[in-house]
Amino acid sequence: MPTSDDDLLIGVESGKYDIGTKGIWKTPAREKKYIFPKNNIGASVIGVTIRSEDANTIKNLDDFAKAGKKLVPIAPQNAQYQVVTDYNAAHLDHPIDLEASENFEIADAYSWVLEGRYDGYFSIELAYQKNVTAKDAPYGQFKDKLTYFRYKALPTYALVNKKETKLAEEVDQALGELKKEGKIAELEKKYFGEELDLLLDKQ
């Protein structure tokens, strides 16, 4: 059943749904509310959209942070907020200025970066590709003015209601079998052009 991110999270927590899948990452807050099977489903590559004119000097997140660049604000309940928080905890000498905000339109984020109001937009690579670089992308008019660099890949999981321990075990077992058979790697290559799980090993 297709649903929004918020409905999935609230629905699985409340018991409306037993399980949900939507590119979910682990966070300490989520681990208190849900069961995460040990085996991940796949991975999401995350990084930063920046102005093309900055691409020669900003090639990674360290460059971005050390240059004192500003990220488009992130909602605290968004898992990406936790990723930047973790980065800052590990890089106390050059943390990223992390501003909390409520949700906003994606078009605003790209416009703010182009205007210079902010210097980067932290997002999933697949979203950048769909929104900016793909054929007939909704913000394709920005593709010559924006570029993207990867930060890291994060494992994504099925999300299971706290009471559904048996279901979580069955899902975990099934995912383990699919991994051993190479089915997940096969699907990643088909839909993403590469085996995303391999990127996790490089972190």
Question: Predicted regions span which residues?
Answer:
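A ligand-binding cleft/hinge motif common to bilobed small-molecule-binding domains
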Residues: 13, 21-32, 82-86, 114, ...
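Flexible hinge/capping segments at coil-to-helix
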Residues: 51-71
